[in-house]
Amino acid sequence: MAQGSNYKVPFRRRREGKTDYAARMKLVDYDKSRLVVRLSNAHATVQVIDYAPEGDITLASAVSKQLANYGYLGGASNTSAVYLTGYLCAKRALAKGVDSAILDIGLKSAIKGSKVFAALKGAVDAGLDIPYGEAVLPDESRINGEHVANYAESLDDDEIAKLFSKYLERGLQPADLPKNFEETKKNIDEAEE
Protein backbone atom coordinates (compact mmCIF):
# COMPACT_ATOMS: atom_id res chain seq x y z
CA MET A 1 0.00 0.00 0.00
CA ALA A 2 1.32 3.44 -0.87
CA GLN A 3 2.16 5.74 2.00
CA GLY A 4 2.84 9.40 2.46
CA SER A 5 0.98 12.67 2.60
CA ASN A 6 0.44 12.79 -1.17
CA TYR A 7 -1.31 9.42 -1.42
CA LYS A 8 -4.98 9.73 -2.27
CA VAL A 9 -7.32 6.82 -1.59
CA PRO A 10 -9.80 6.31 -4.46
CA PHE A 11 -13.52 6.19 -3.74
CA ARG A 12 -14.65 2.81 -2.42
CA ARG A 13 -16.82 1.89 -5.46
CA ARG A 14 -13.93 2.81 -7.76
CA ARG A 15 -11.55 0.61 -5.74
CA GLU A 16 -14.05 -2.27 -5.95
CA GLY A 17 -14.32 -1.85 -9.72
CA LYS A 18 -18.03 -0.99 -9.61
CA THR A 19 -18.28 2.66 -10.69
CA ASP A 20 -16.45 4.88 -13.15
CA TYR A 21 -17.31 8.25 -11.64
CA ALA A 22 -16.02 10.31 -14.57
CA ALA A 23 -18.26 8.44 -17.01
CA ARG A 24 -21.20 8.52 -14.57
CA MET A 25 -20.97 12.31 -14.21
CA LYS A 26 -21.14 12.72 -17.99
CA LEU A 27 -24.20 10.47 -18.17
CA VAL A 28 -26.18 12.08 -15.35
CA ASP A 29 -25.66 15.56 -16.85
CA TYR A 30 -28.19 14.68 -19.58
CA ASP A 31 -31.89 15.29 -19.00
CA LYS A 32 -32.62 11.80 -20.33
CA SER A 33 -33.06 8.55 -18.47
CA ARG A 34 -30.27 5.95 -18.68
CA LEU A 35 -30.68 2.45 -20.12
CA VAL A 36 -28.35 0.58 -17.76
CA VAL A 37 -27.10 -2.82 -18.95
CA ARG A 38 -25.28 -5.08 -16.49
CA LEU A 39 -24.10 -8.57 -17.42
CA SER A 40 -22.96 -11.49 -15.29
CA ASN A 41 -21.91 -15.00 -16.27
CA ALA A 42 -25.39 -16.31 -15.45
CA HIS A 43 -27.86 -13.47 -16.13
CA ALA A 44 -28.40 -10.03 -17.58
CA THR A 45 -30.10 -7.04 -15.97
CA VAL A 46 -31.45 -4.09 -17.93
CA GLN A 47 -32.91 -1.06 -16.17
CA VAL A 48 -34.18 2.38 -17.09
CA ILE A 49 -32.94 4.76 -14.40
CA ASP A 50 -33.38 8.47 -13.68
CA TYR A 51 -30.88 10.49 -11.68
CA ALA A 52 -31.95 12.14 -8.42
CA PRO A 53 -29.62 13.86 -5.91
CA GLU A 54 -30.79 11.60 -3.08
CA GLY A 55 -30.29 8.46 -5.17
CA ASP A 56 -31.11 7.05 -8.59
CA ILE A 57 -34.73 6.12 -9.32
CA THR A 58 -35.43 2.89 -11.20
CA LEU A 59 -38.34 3.41 -13.60
CA ALA A 60 -38.36 -0.01 -15.28
CA SER A 61 -36.34 -3.17 -14.87
CA ALA A 62 -36.00 -6.62 -16.40
CA VAL A 63 -33.79 -9.59 -15.52
CA SER A 64 -33.13 -12.42 -17.97
CA LYS A 65 -34.50 -14.94 -15.44
CA GLN A 66 -37.93 -13.40 -16.04
CA LEU A 67 -37.90 -14.56 -19.68
CA ALA A 68 -38.97 -18.04 -18.55
CA ASN A 69 -42.35 -16.48 -17.66
CA TYR A 70 -42.78 -15.65 -21.36
CA GLY A 71 -41.83 -19.12 -22.61
CA TYR A 72 -38.10 -18.67 -23.26
CA LEU A 73 -36.21 -21.95 -22.84
CA GLY A 74 -32.68 -20.89 -23.84
CA GLY A 75 -29.82 -19.81 -21.61
CA ALA A 76 -30.25 -16.68 -19.49
CA SER A 77 -26.92 -15.09 -20.43
CA ASN A 78 -26.66 -15.60 -24.20
CA THR A 79 -27.09 -12.88 -26.82
CA SER A 80 -30.72 -13.83 -27.51
CA ALA A 81 -31.62 -13.58 -23.82
CA VAL A 82 -29.90 -10.21 -23.45
CA TYR A 83 -31.77 -8.86 -26.50
CA LEU A 84 -35.10 -10.09 -25.09
CA THR A 85 -34.28 -8.62 -21.67
CA GLY A 86 -33.64 -5.22 -23.27
CA TYR A 87 -36.86 -5.60 -25.26
CA LEU A 88 -38.87 -6.45 -22.12
CA CYS A 89 -37.38 -3.58 -20.11
CA ALA A 90 -38.12 -1.09 -22.89
CA LYS A 91 -41.74 -2.27 -23.13
CA ARG A 92 -42.12 -1.71 -19.38
CA ALA A 93 -40.46 1.73 -19.63
CA LEU A 94 -42.75 2.77 -22.48
CA ALA A 95 -45.77 1.72 -20.39
CA LYS A 96 -44.56 4.11 -17.66
CA GLY A 97 -44.17 7.02 -20.08
CA VAL A 98 -40.42 6.92 -20.74
CA ASP A 99 -39.80 7.39 -24.45
CA SER A 100 -36.07 8.15 -24.69
CA ALA A 101 -32.85 7.22 -22.91
CA ILE A 102 -29.08 7.02 -23.29
CA LEU A 103 -27.02 3.84 -23.01
CA ASP A 104 -25.01 3.22 -19.82
CA ILE A 105 -22.66 0.23 -20.12
CA GLY A 106 -20.77 0.87 -16.89
CA LEU A 107 -17.26 -0.57 -16.85
CA LYS A 108 -17.83 -2.86 -19.86
CA SER A 109 -15.81 -2.24 -23.00
CA ALA A 110 -17.75 -1.02 -26.02
CA ILE A 111 -17.02 -3.93 -28.37
CA LYS A 112 -18.86 -4.10 -31.69
CA GLY A 113 -21.54 -6.81 -31.70
CA SER A 114 -21.32 -7.51 -27.96
CA LYS A 115 -24.19 -8.47 -25.66
CA VAL A 116 -24.42 -4.92 -24.33
CA PHE A 117 -25.40 -3.75 -27.79
CA ALA A 118 -27.84 -6.65 -28.16
CA ALA A 119 -29.73 -5.19 -25.18
CA LEU A 120 -29.59 -1.78 -26.87
CA LYS A 121 -31.06 -3.24 -30.07
CA GLY A 122 -33.82 -4.91 -28.07
CA ALA A 123 -34.74 -1.62 -26.42
CA VAL A 124 -34.69 0.25 -29.74
CA ASP A 125 -36.80 -2.44 -31.44
CA ALA A 126 -39.34 -2.14 -28.63
CA GLY A 127 -39.71 1.58 -29.38
CA LEU A 128 -37.36 3.36 -26.98
CA ASP A 129 -35.51 6.28 -28.62
CA ILE A 130 -31.79 5.80 -27.91
CA PRO A 131 -28.95 7.36 -29.95
CA TYR A 132 -26.59 4.74 -31.41
CA GLY A 133 -24.58 3.82 -34.49
CA GLU A 134 -25.69 0.90 -36.68
CA ALA A 135 -22.14 -0.46 -36.89
CA VAL A 136 -22.03 -1.55 -33.22
CA LEU A 137 -25.14 -3.76 -33.29
CA PRO A 138 -24.83 -7.56 -33.52
CA ASP A 139 -26.10 -9.37 -36.62
CA GLU A 140 -29.73 -10.45 -36.69
CA SER A 141 -28.65 -14.10 -37.02
CA ARG A 142 -26.70 -13.87 -33.74
CA ILE A 143 -29.57 -12.16 -31.94
CA ASN A 144 -32.18 -14.78 -32.80
CA GLY A 145 -29.82 -17.73 -32.28
CA GLU A 146 -29.45 -18.96 -35.86
CA HIS A 147 -25.71 -19.42 -35.36
CA VAL A 148 -26.43 -21.81 -32.45
CA ALA A 149 -28.95 -23.74 -34.54
CA ASN A 150 -26.49 -24.02 -37.44
CA TYR A 151 -23.73 -25.21 -35.12
CA ALA A 152 -26.04 -27.79 -33.52
CA GLU A 153 -26.96 -29.19 -36.94
CA SER A 154 -23.28 -29.91 -37.62
CA LEU A 155 -22.96 -32.07 -34.46
CA ASP A 156 -23.94 -35.67 -33.86
CA ASP A 157 -26.42 -36.67 -31.11
CA ASP A 158 -23.77 -37.46 -28.48
CA GLU A 159 -22.11 -34.07 -28.88
CA ILE A 160 -25.49 -32.30 -28.75
CA ALA A 161 -26.37 -34.12 -25.52
CA LYS A 162 -23.02 -33.11 -24.05
CA LEU A 163 -22.90 -29.45 -25.18
CA PHE A 164 -26.59 -28.53 -24.93
CA SER A 165 -27.65 -30.55 -21.88
CA LYS A 166 -29.39 -27.58 -20.18
CA TYR A 167 -31.41 -26.83 -23.31
CA LEU A 168 -32.46 -30.47 -23.56
CA GLU A 169 -33.43 -30.54 -19.85
CA ARG A 170 -35.78 -27.62 -20.51
CA GLY A 171 -37.26 -29.39 -23.55
CA LEU A 172 -35.61 -27.25 -26.22
CA GLN A 173 -33.72 -28.70 -29.16
CA PRO A 174 -30.84 -26.34 -30.06
CA ALA A 175 -32.05 -26.21 -33.66
CA ASP A 176 -35.36 -24.77 -32.41
CA LEU A 177 -33.79 -21.78 -30.61
CA PRO A 178 -34.73 -19.21 -33.33
CA LYS A 179 -38.35 -20.39 -33.25
CA ASN A 180 -38.44 -20.19 -29.43
CA PHE A 181 -36.90 -16.70 -29.64
CA GLU A 182 -39.68 -15.47 -31.95
CA GLU A 183 -42.40 -17.05 -29.78
CA THR A 184 -40.97 -15.38 -26.67
CA LYS A 185 -40.81 -12.00 -28.40
CA LYS A 186 -44.44 -12.39 -29.46
CA ASN A 187 -45.45 -13.37 -25.91
CA ILE A 188 -43.71 -10.27 -24.51
CA ASP A 189 -45.59 -8.09 -27.02
CA GLU A 190 -48.92 -9.61 -26.00
CA ALA A 191 -48.27 -9.47 -22.25
CA GLU A 192 -46.80 -5.96 -22.05
CA GLU A 193 -49.45 -4.11 -24.11
From Swiss-Prot:
- Top-rank taxon of the source lineage equals Archaea
Xref: InterPro entries: Rbsml_uL18_euk (IPR005485)
One annotated GO molecular function is: 5S rRNA binding
**GO biological process assignments:** ribosomal large subunit assembly; translation
Q: Which UniProt keywords are listed?
A: Ribonucleoprotein, Ribosomal protein, RNA-binding, rRNA-binding
Coiled-coil region(s) at which residues?
none
GO annotation, cellular component aspect = cytosolic large ribosomal subunit
Q: Which family does it belong to?
A: Belongs to the universal ribosomal protein uL18 family.
On subunit structure and binding partners, the annotation says:
Part of the 50S ribosomal subunit. Contacts the 5S and 23S rRNAs.
Output the PANTHER family linked to this UniProt entry: LARGE RIBOSOMAL SUBUNIT PROTEIN UL18, RIBOSOMAL PROTEIN L5-RELATED
What is this protein's function per UniProt?
A: This is one of the proteins that bind and probably mediate the attachment of the 5S RNA into the large ribosomal subunit, where it forms part of the central protuberance.
Q: Mind telling me what this protein is named?
A: Large ribosomal subunit protein uL18
Query: Which species does this protein come from?
Result: Methanobrevibacter smithii (strain ATCC 35061 / DSM 861 / OCM 144 / PS)
